[in-house]
C-alpha cells in the first residue's frame, strides 16, 4: 500500500535534499524522453519493442538519447532489455512490473494534463498579459 499524505510529508521533511530518492526518481522518470519511452512501450503489442521501433515511435529523439534513456530506465528496473543471440543481433525492451505500476500515476497525470491544458493555457495568457501591462 502507498504512503499516507502524513507519511509522505514526513519522508520529504526528514530526508536531506541531496539524498532524496523522490527528487532523484522524479528527475529521471519525469524527463521528456522517459515518459515517451514508457508510453510507447505501453502502446506496443505485449509492451515489447525493438530499438528501431522505439526510434520510429518517438518523434524527435536521437539514437544517443534513446540509448541513454533506455539504459537509465533499465538501471532503475522500469524496463528490461533482452538480447537474442542472432545475426544481426535482436534486442527487445519491455516494461517490468515496476514499469507497469509506474504507468498508473503517469496515465493519471497525462489525463489530468489533457483535461486541464485549456485552462492552463488561459492562465498563462492572463498572467503574460498582466506581466506585459506592468512592464509598460
What are these regions (language model features)?
Residues 20-65:
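N-terminal helix-turn-helix DNA-binding core of bacterial DNA-binding proteins
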Residues 37, 50, 82, 120-122:
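Short, hydrophobic secondary-structure boundary micro-motifs
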Residues 2-7, 19, 103-136:
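Amphipathic alpha-helical dimerization/coiled-coil segments
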Residues 5-26:
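Short, Lys/Arg-enriched N-terminal segment that forms or immediately precedes the first helix
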Residues 51-84, 88:
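Canonical helix-turn-helix DNA-binding module
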Residues 86-108:
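Basic, amphipathic "hinge/linker" alpha-helix immediately C-terminal to the N-terminal HTH DNA-binding motif
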Residues 27, 31, 35, 100, ...:
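Generic detection of well-ordered alpha-helical segments
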